[in-house]
């Protein structure tokens, strides 16, 4: 037996017990004739004591222990003289009588501490060492607890967990697929699933009216803090349901997770916001409603006064930052540079301060009378000490998105985005289609199987851009943590959808014939939702990136620097797969 207890288990009630522990050397220090070693495992840290007066030879061996050596000890639990209130085992120590070195270790490239000295790149390369840190390990423990709770919750509601294939056919809509060549079928390829969408719909046709899966999904797209090329969904589908049924079920799951994971009781129904309102007031389909600063359109007030930037604009909008009138010129210049960054793309920013006497001082005073500036103040309901920030542009949607970035930045600067405050909502009534300039055609905003709202179906023939989707996203703190829709279950309506998306009947049959054929055998009304497990965990853990809650993540270039993947294949493998690599210059 390597251990009788873990390194996080022993307490004052265990004093005088003989125990056996195994783990890694966190640190050691010599003080007079005593050597103290902190022994660590997944469960915690226990202090070991080696005493020269009791066993000089054993103490000498302990002095040679290096960081991260794997050791086993036998000893007696003793009450600590100098207690450590920061760890659960801080009232006790182990007086060691036997030491067995199970494995030596070279010096790690960074300290295995919560506040490590290792940068992101080095920690990614040695991820197996990074996972020894309690800060990282606790994220995976939280992830485990979440999956257990999800399975338990859905099981009690009659959902069946069903695994769907990972090797499937490629589909043209959405993000790029990762493809896998087939050795047995030269020149043909599988795709890794972006989601189990069509497969779970087939399960509904099969009569499995409540399905779920903790599903690994893959998307070959540009990465950012909340995206990885492979990620995990809590994927669900239900038959004989309407939108309200799905929302009720999964709002219930969200409230359950908040209760059991964060001990937060959410009793009120989550608010619902139409997509058009979210874009108008926040410039985002995933608004952070922890704080205000809603957009105010200012065209009627600011246009036509000789300031050409505004006079030529298609949209003028602003936000009011309460109590921020004390911003210095340097801070305001920094905000201007922020919105002018290439990834945001604004051409400039106008500001107006509300002075203590109620007058308004702006950066464009020479174009506007105090009377007009007072109208500006009234439009926001601004008070003395407030700061108004204004952007304009020739594309209303683009300018609102720029203003959204400015709003979020101000929320950060003013401390309004507390990670321990949670604001949940449903965004509903999305457009069914969006126009793609690149493709020159309508694209499905969600996917081709999303049902239009019944009251908008008649618009498919006359004004498809005005059709709203029977779709819904759950947003928490400005992060889309899940989304879904009621699906099309009628073959004729699905064919109409393919037609509007530019599919020929032949191409639709080639890509989705298996689904359309299944519908002919009686498809029930159905709908579903997928939660992003990684995003939920990062939200509950207060992380800035989902990377920190994935055991072995990729970096921002999609590389696994630990495994050095992706990598070139051996020529013999390429030959076996009938592949030739032709890299364009």
UniProtKB/Swiss-Prot annotation:
Keyword ATP-binding appears in the UniProt entry: yes
Membrane-spanning ranges: none
Keywords: Aminoacyl-tRNA synthetase, ATP-binding, Cytoplasm, Ligase, Nucleotide-binding, Protein biosynthesis
GO biological process, one term: aspartyl-tRNA aminoacylation
InterPro entries named among the record's database cross-references: Aa-tRNA-synt_II, aa-tRNA-synth_II, aa-tRNA-synth_II/BPL/LPL, Asp-tRNA-ligase_1, Asp-tRNA-ligase_1_N, Asp/Asn-tRNA-synth_IIb, AspRS_core, GAD-like_sf
Localization per record: Cytoplasm
Subunit structure: Homodimer.
Protein name per its UniProtKB record: Aspartate--tRNA ligase
Source species: Bacteroides fragilis (strain ATCC 25285 / DSM 2151 / CCUG 4856 / JCM 11019 / LMG 10263 / NCTC 9343 / Onslow / VPI 2553 / EN-2)
